[in-house]
Amino acid sequence: MSDLQTPLVRPKRKKTWVDYFVKFRWIIVIFIVLPFSATFYFLIYLGDMWSESKSFEKRQKEHDENVKKVIKRLKGRDASKDGLVCTARKPWIAVGMRNVDYKRARHFEVDLGEFRNILEINKEKMTARVEPLVNMGQISRATVPMNLSLAVVAELDDLTVGGLINGYGIEGSSHIYGLFADTVEAYEIVLAGGELVRATRDNEYSDLYYAIPWSQGTLGLLVAAEIRLIKVKEYMRLTYIPVKGDLQALAQGYIDSFAPKDGDKSKIPDFVEGMVYNPTEGVMMVGTYASKEEAKKKGNKINNVGWWFKPWFYQHAQTALKKGQFVEYIPTREYYHRHTRCLYWEGKLILPFGDQFWFRYLLGWLMPPKVSLLKATQGEAIRNYYHDMHVIQDMLVPLYKVGDALEWVHREMEVYPIWLCPHKLFKQPIKGQIYPEPGFEYENRQGDTEDAQMYTDVGVYYAPGCVLRGEEFDGSEAVRRMEKWLIENHGFQPQYAVSELDEKSFWRMFNGELYEECRKKYRAIGTFMSVYYKSKKGRKTEKEVREAEQAHLETAYAEAD
């Protein structure tokens, strides 16, 4: 370990064939991954158009038929012979760093592949009822032309409703609406016994409603969700604010950009995002919805960031460090998906020249490479290399600890840029897996309200500085230290990422009381794998799965300090 004044000193690392393969992986990406990605995106687009051409009545009829198939499949499972229930989705399709190793053990597949339709957009109730495989690109394409939107639209097009609910989802509007699951009005779940139930905040299944988020699909199978809509305008008026100083100063500049010290709610923007480019420089962005008439007024600049030849968004934002604060108008849907084309800044590692003018104009229209195809074209050695030499982690920390988190990341990982996105963590009537610090409402900290503590997602996505310099780096050990720091600081780690937590530590980070009560009440034990074991790193044999499920009755979190 090191302290802030004494950085970690690492020896040089001997290169292997994997290093060279990763360095020249762009050849496979250009000639295989990008063409296939573009083809897949086009076919998916045609499928979405076909779905939208159907009447809502037709879509509902198909939905009902597919739900019956799921129920029949579950009821046909022999608990004494068949493995635990998993979806039939292939491991490489998921957008995440986990290997989905639990599917390597014998398991009982239930196919949810047909659940990809928008079932209803209700302008009176201001809700959208959608199936779990509807993705963010699909729903924003359907709603934004109506001047409507989900309250929280995760940035990457391929992220699905089911993943954002069962796992974790955030966006620049989360400082108002909370995480993606906080905007869901109702879940439609098929339970272990084949019963279809509708869970809301205030019906008989309210406990299930609060237990579903972060459960990774281990309480039941999500077949539909009713999600809150908000009214939006055609453009986002975006202000780029450069901030310079040490990491604590950057953190305070970020906090001040959206959380007024006087508590005046009229000063709170519609969207917030921060990017820290190095230990002394960052750019904070605040956005408010704007009409087409306002955007097109003389003197206002419109930036269509979605065009394939445009500079990558994070690099465009970085220009504020040289030219100072500036304002521009971005079409709303293009703003929502501003990080899709370059996958935040991971595109720079995948295609080192992908941000160059010539590439953007000639081949930029093929971007981004589909994450699932990137995973499908890497073997075990490459996958392990990324786990060891690369970081893709999110640290959810209380807002007042953002500066400490930035210092920790700099000291232990030295990864830049760093993404900052605030979100409310609501004090719920029933405590779920994640929850605010006890007594936060009495501290009157900047950004907090009576019903929610303000948190921030500190997004760490890139190769550490020591790896870029050819030095040694132990990715597993770094993640273990990160998880320890999060537990000590009442933070949380989204489980789409690779986790090194043992079971006891997992239930120190997360609250398992409601989850375990629902596992027993709705008979998920013996049918669905536990959330810890589903998130656990490494291969799993059928014997291990069975033993873990048996041991789950004596939960590790009951022993937690």
Curated annotation (Swiss-Prot):
So what EC number does this one have?
1.3.1.72
Q: GO biological process: any one? A: unidimensional cell growth
Q: How does it assemble?
A: Interacts with calmodulin.
Q: Which stretches of this protein does UniProt put in the Cytoplasmic compartment?
A: 47-561
How changing residue 172 to E affects the protein? Answer: In dwf1-10; dwarf phenotype
Q: Which residues form the FAD-binding PCMH-type domain?
A: 49-232
Keywords on record? Calmodulin-binding, Endoplasmic reticulum, Membrane, Microsome, NADP, Oxidoreductase, Phosphoprotein, Signal-anchor, Transmembrane, Transmembrane helix
Which PROSITE patterns does this chain map to? FAD_PCMH (PS51387)
**Per its record, how is this protein called by name?**
Delta(24)-sterol reductase
Q: What does this protein do?
A: Plays a critical role in the general process of plant cell elongation. Involved in the synthesis of campesterol, an early precursor of brassinolide. Required for the conversion of 24-methylenecholesterol to campesterol and for the conversion of isofucosterol to sitosterol. Necessary for both the isomerization and reduction of 24-methylenecholesterol. Regulates indirectly phytochrome-mediated light responses through the modulation of brassinosteroid biosynthesis.
Gene this chain is encoded by:
DIM
Residues recorded as bearing Phosphoserine in the entry: 2
Q: Which family does it belong to?
A: Belongs to the DIMINUTO family.
Q: Which reaction does it catalyse?
A: lathosterol + NADP(+) = 5alpha-cholesta-7,24-dien-3beta-ol + NADPH + H(+)
Statement: the UniProt record of this protein carries the keyword Endoplasmic reticulum = yes
What species does this protein belong to?
A: Arabidopsis thaliana
Q: Name one GO molecular function term.
A: FAD binding
**Matches recorded under SUPFAM superfamilies:** FAD-binding/transporter-associated domain-like (SSF56176)
* Phenotype upon loss of function: Dwarf and reduced fertility.
Q: Which InterPro entries match?
A: Diminuto-like (IPR040165), FAD-bd_PCMH (IPR016166), FAD-bd_PCMH-like_sf (IPR036318), FAD-bd_PCMH_sub2 (IPR016169), Oxid_FAD_bind_N (IPR006094)
